[in-house]
């Protein structure tokens, strides 16, 4: 049974579930594909990993295992330079598998459970006690424990809010994996496999370091809410909770010697949400008061409350997929035709200050009920408590291919695939204020997705067994592959359309500690905080519906003719089994890639530079005029395509088994990749600005990819030590893995089964 888990949204580097969604001990076989010329495989342009999970047999089998790793099991030097004392760290994994027959030869089961624990200390700092002095070397903050106790008691007595501990900050990371599989031999010609797996990963974090709204900038003056100058409480921490639930059913049918069919259904529910131990309550920053001259000290002293970026912050992704492959065997031909359907919904919720935000000038101001110097709240329109940006689409694919055994030692595979991506516009609302902006004749419509466009992927591949004994094989092919784009780049459009939620900020601005402007509405908050959003809306007469939408400074869009990424791949490889007394093979492979529809970003508010001047001499960069934009103060960044970019990979791999139970591998890979942009981020404006250019992001040229590793060596050794004890077969495996030449760090792992 094959199933691929994708990080569809793309806000993190990890796979769904915060890592591997399935335990390695539940996997029977892993297939890595880089250039498969089988048209049944799609939705990737770099590579794909397919996993076949273990199944039960007629024999009851079980295993128990544990992994342990700490700071002493990794290297500690680079180029001969010792990095000093290693911070304490540990990771422990416990797991078990069990499988067997329910009805012999008919019905089988397999189950796996795995738990991973990593003790963490995300907050090393502590508040100082009476008689202590602040000490950076020993992580003692200037904030006093007695002041923290005053704030905690005050919030409990006046508002009924529990701040959590001021001295204990538990933050252990936990991961749970469950998998169950049933295999049913319905008849000799029909077999059904059903799998369910669940993964949950929880990792705790300290509150955001210094981001804020209002005031004289977007940061708390380059300091941190937890550190030498300031402390926070345990309930202001937040967790990153990653959950994956997936079920799949695979029905394989053989109707005759010439006709077979595979029907595969999968449903996956992925959630990456923030969690907290806090009840809903405003987040509070308390500044350090005033200096001897009466000027405001622009540094934090203490924070409390529901972490300001956690409420309704998360990504949800639901995928339903149905695939049917029909195969007909006609002599030397294996003809396959298929259809695939995928429905996908992705939502992104992000409400900074979703429970309210207050910033006070000093501890005394806060405790005595003075007006705050900043107030902020983000809330959903029409009473919606969990507003979110959403994208929904259906993908329909049709394909056909023929595997032709031209000769007993030559096989040719050729086929074609058609994929159509259809977006659902009902998720969107047009912001007329954005649409009315004229960017040199171009407009951004936040009320519709790109039009449906069929994408075609023809492919052809071959395998030639030169001597008809598998000792020398030549293989290769060429074709087009269609992939996906992280969905965060789509949800940026409704997120930045100002049609989802309303953000309110009342602030005070300072220059050198002296207030130069003050929002008078802050004075209405003297006497105590408003802790309910409905009360805040009523008190300040805030809008509850979208009355007069405005265009923000950051505008996101998707070009109407946008296409999912496509790449043309060509590969040639040679596999050679050397005539030795033990298995020894060498593989050489070369892959060339050329972009057809790569993805990049364009700021359509930038004017045509054809009439702009250049610097003189060697530095002939463009000189931007003062009126280089169509609309002042706006960034209008849209997703678009480019055909620029190419690359290649050359690899040599040696595999050997010099003695029984000893497997060795050595591989060298050289890679070159040129592109316009690797999309280094998730925010459209910052990603566009982060493009490496000479004349500006809109005029970027092809350059080496920032993600390419030009040269890499991998070596691996695996040795199995089987032994029997009281009739039970046990095995000890020793694995050594040497990852990359620039990082001489050998990690060892011992597994007891």
Regions found by a protein language model. Give the residues of each.
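Gram-negative outer-membrane beta-barrel transporters
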Residues: 585-728, 737-742
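Solvent-exposed loop/turn elements at secondary-structure boundaries
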Residues: 427-457, 461-638, 753
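Hydrophobic, lipid-facing positions within transmembrane beta-strands of outer-membrane proteins
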Residues: 45-47, 92-96, 176-180, 243-249, ...
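Transmembrane beta-barrel strands of outer-membrane/channel proteins
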Residues: 64-70, 111-115, 194-198, 263-269, ...
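Residue-level signature of outer-membrane beta-barrel architecture
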Residues: 34, 53, 100-102, 184-186, ...
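Acidic, glycine-rich flexible loop segments
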Residues: 1-48, 54-232, 239-243, 257, ...
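Short loop/turn motifs that connect adjacent beta-strands in outer-membrane beta-barrel proteins
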Residues: 39-42, 56-61, 103-106, 189, ...
């Amino acid at each position: 049974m094959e199933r691929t888990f994708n990080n569809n949204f793309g806000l993190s580097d990890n796979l769904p579930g915060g890592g591997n969604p399935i335990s390695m001990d539940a996997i029977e076989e892993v297939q890595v594909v880089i250039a498969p010329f089988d048209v049944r495989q799609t939705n990737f342009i770099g590579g794909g990993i397919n996993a076949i999970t273990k199944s039960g047999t007629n024999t009851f089998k079980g295993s128990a295992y544990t992994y342990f790793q700490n700071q002493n099991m990794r290297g500690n030097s680079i180029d001969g330079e010792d990095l000093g004392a290693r911070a304490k760290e540990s990771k422990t994994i416990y797991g078990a598998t069990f499988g067997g027959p329910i009805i012999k030869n008919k019905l089988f089961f397999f189950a796996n459970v795995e738990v991973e624990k990593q003790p963490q200390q995300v907050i090393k700092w502590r508040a100082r006690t009476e008689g202590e002095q602040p000490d950076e070397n020993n992580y003692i903050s200037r904030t006093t424990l007695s002041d923290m106790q005053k704030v905690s008691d005050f919030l409990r007595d006046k508002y009924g809010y529990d701040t959590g501990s001021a001295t204990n900050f538990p933050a252990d990371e936990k991961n749970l994996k469950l998998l169950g599989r049933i295999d049913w031999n319905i008849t000799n010609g029909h077999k059904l496999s059903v799998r369910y797996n669940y993964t949950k990963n929880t990792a705790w974090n300290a509150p955001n370091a210094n981001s804020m709204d209002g005031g004289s900038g977007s940061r708390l003056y380059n300091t941190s809410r937890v550190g030498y100058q300031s402390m926070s409480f345990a309930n202001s921490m937040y967790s990153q909770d990653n959950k994956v639930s997936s079920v799949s059913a695979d029905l394989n049918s053989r109707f005759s010697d010439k006709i077979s069919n595979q029907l595969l259904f999968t449903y996956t529910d992925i959630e990456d949400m923030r969690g907290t131990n806090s009840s809903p309550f405003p987040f509070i920053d308390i500044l350090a008061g005033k200096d001897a001259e009466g000027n405001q000290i622009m540094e934090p002293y203490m924070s409390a409350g529901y972490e300001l970026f956690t409420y309704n912050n998360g990504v949800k992704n639901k995928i339903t997929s149905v695939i049917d492959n029909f195969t007909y065997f006609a002599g030397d031909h294996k003809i396959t035709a298929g259809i695939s359907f995928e429905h996908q919904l992705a939502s992104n919720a992000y409400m900074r200050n979703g429970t309210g935000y207050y910033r006070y000038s000093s501890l005394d101001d806060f405790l005595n009920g003075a007006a705050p110097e900043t107030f902020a709240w983000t809330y959903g329109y029409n009473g919606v408590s969990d507003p979110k940006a959403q994208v929904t689409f259906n993908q329909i694919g049709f394909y056909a291919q023929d595997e032709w055994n031209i000769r007993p030692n030559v096989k040719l595979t050729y086929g074609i695939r058609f994929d159509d991506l259809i977006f659902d516009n009902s998720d969107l609302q047009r912001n007329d204020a954005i649409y009315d902006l004229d960017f040199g004749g171009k407009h951004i419509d936040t009320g519709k997705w790109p039009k449906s466009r069929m994408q075609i992927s023809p492919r052809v591949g071959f395998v030639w067994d030169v001597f008809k004994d598998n000792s020398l094989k030549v293989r290769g092919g060429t074709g087009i592959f269609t992939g996906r784009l992280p969905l965060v780049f789509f949800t940026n459009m409704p997120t930045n359309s100002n049609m989802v939620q309303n953000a309110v900020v009342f602030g005070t601005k300072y220059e050198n500690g002296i207030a130069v402007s003050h929002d008078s509405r802050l004075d209405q908050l003297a006497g105590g905080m408003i802790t309910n959003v409905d009360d805040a809306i009523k008190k300040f007469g805030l809008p509850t519906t979208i009355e007069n939408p405005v265009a923000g400074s950051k505008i996101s869009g998707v070009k109407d003719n946008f296409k999912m990424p496509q790449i043309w791949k060509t590969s040639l490889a040679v596999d050679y089994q050397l005539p030795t007394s033990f298995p020894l093979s060498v593989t050489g492979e070369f892959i060339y890639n050329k972009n057809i529809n790569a993805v990049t970003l364009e700021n359509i508010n930038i004017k045509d530079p054809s009439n702009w001047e250049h610097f003189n001499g060697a530095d002939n960069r463009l000189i931007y005029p003062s009126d280089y934009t169509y609309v002042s103060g706006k960034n209008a960044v849209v997703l678009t395509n480019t055909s620029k970019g190419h690359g290649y990979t050359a690899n040599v791999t040696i595999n050997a088994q010099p003695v029984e139970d000893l497997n060795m591998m050595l591989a060298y890979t050289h890679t070159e990749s040129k592109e316009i942009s690797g999309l280094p981020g998730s925010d459209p404006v910052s990603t566009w600005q982060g493009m490496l250019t000479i004349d500006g992001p809109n005029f970027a040229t092809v350059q080496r990819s920032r993600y390419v590793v030009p040269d890499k060596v991998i070596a691996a050794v695996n040795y199995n030590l089987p032994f029997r004890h009281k009739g039970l077969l046990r095995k000890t495996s020793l694995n050594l893995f040497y990852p990359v030449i620039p990082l001489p760090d050998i990690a060892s792992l011992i597994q007891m089964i």
